[in-house]
A protein has these predicted regions:
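Residue(s) in the substrate-gating loop at a strand-loop-helix junction
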Residues: 142
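Substrate-binding pocket helix/loop in short-chain dehydrogenase/reductase
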Residues: 98-99, 103-111, 216
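Short, small/polar-rich loop/turn modules that mediate ligand/substrate recognition or access, typified
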Residues: 174, 179, 246-248
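C-terminal substrate-recognition "lid" of short-chain dehydrogenase/reductases
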Residues: 81, 119-120, 126, 130, ...
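Conserved glycine-rich Rossmann-like NAD(P)H-binding loop of the short-chain dehydrogenase/reductase
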Residues: 27-44
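Conserved glycine-rich cofactor-binding loop
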Residues: 6, 13-15
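Active-site helix of classical SDR
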Residues: 122, 158, 166
Length: 260
């Protein structure tokens, strides 16, 4: 379905981003992988995996909080992969603390990584997508882009911001063949979430399985993790012709979290 298209997926060396990149490559899209601090061995393994899928693949270590590094990654995608047809803004970090104890530098880092980076990247690719008459901007938001949780002020602010930014991008691209949508996952067993599970294990002195169940029970009625593969499947749908008139939307994939 996506043969001949090229996708940049930020934060795609693991977790949700890798799941999305695999799903897009499975439909024939060339992939620009991105990670920060990945080892040469990890990069080589990823390139081998994607090349075996029959698509072109490149890797760029851009720090998504640095506009000049994102610009260099976009230039590399044009030079090595033929352009940018799909942009998936996925890179994110988390920090948990009450507002009155939240370190300012941590706030700045979360906003820069989770929100500002999407603006930096989108502004670099939007004009070319409009000129081409086809493009997909997919922002990985969160259930926390729609509802809040205590202790996550920066993350919630950033993810609410991503949903709003998605809508503005959709309005400014309406009628051009470019769409902009957000995916709002609930709990996904990524390295980011595993850290929160580890914290519960340490605090409560319970097993990993018990901590996982406790985490899920607090928010996610299905009591099952969303998988990166499921999120990748939704991203593929949003790139399809069937989704050509879906824009400015925020799709929950959260086991019923925000239905409560």
């Amino acid at each position: 379905m996506l043969k001949g298209k090229t996708a940049i997926v930020t934060g795609s060396s693991s977790g949700i981003g890798l799941g999305v990149a695999r799903a897009l490559a499975g439909q024939g899209a060339n992939i620009m992988l991105n990670g920060f601090g990945d080892t040469p061995e990890t990069v080589a393994k990823l390139k081998t995996e994607f090349a075996a899928m029959g698509v072109k693949v490149d890797y760029n270590p851009a720090d998504v909080t640095k506009p000049d590094q994102l610009a260099a990654m976009v230039d590399a995608a044009h030079k090595n992969l033929g352009g940018v047809d799909i942009l998936v803004n996925n890179a994110g970090i988390q920090f948990v603390s009450p507002i009155d104890q939240f370190p300012i530098e941590k706030w700045d880092a979360v906003i820069a990584t989770n929100l500002s980076s999407a603006f930096y990247a989108t502004r670099l690719v939007l004009d070319a997508m409009k000129t081409k008459g086809w493009g997909r901007v997919i922002n990985i938001a969160s259930a926390h882009g729609l509802v809040a949780s205590a202790g996550k002020s920066a993350y919630v602010a950033a993810k609410h911001g991503i949903v709003g930014f998605t809508k503005v991008t959709a309005l400014e691209s309406a009628g051009t063949g470019v769409t902009s949508n957000a995916i709002c996952p609930g709990w996904v067993l990524t390295p980011l979430v595993q850290k929160q599970i580890d914290a519960i294990v340490a605090k409560d002195g319970i097993s990993n399985a018990q901590a996982s169940e406790k985490l899920l029970s607090e928010k996610q009625p299905s009591k099952q993790f969303v998988t990166p593969e499921q999120i990748g499947g939704l991203a593929v749908f949003l790139c399809s012709d069937a989704a050509a008139q879906i824009t400015g939307s925020a799709y929950s994939i959260d086991g019923g979290w925000v239905a409560q």
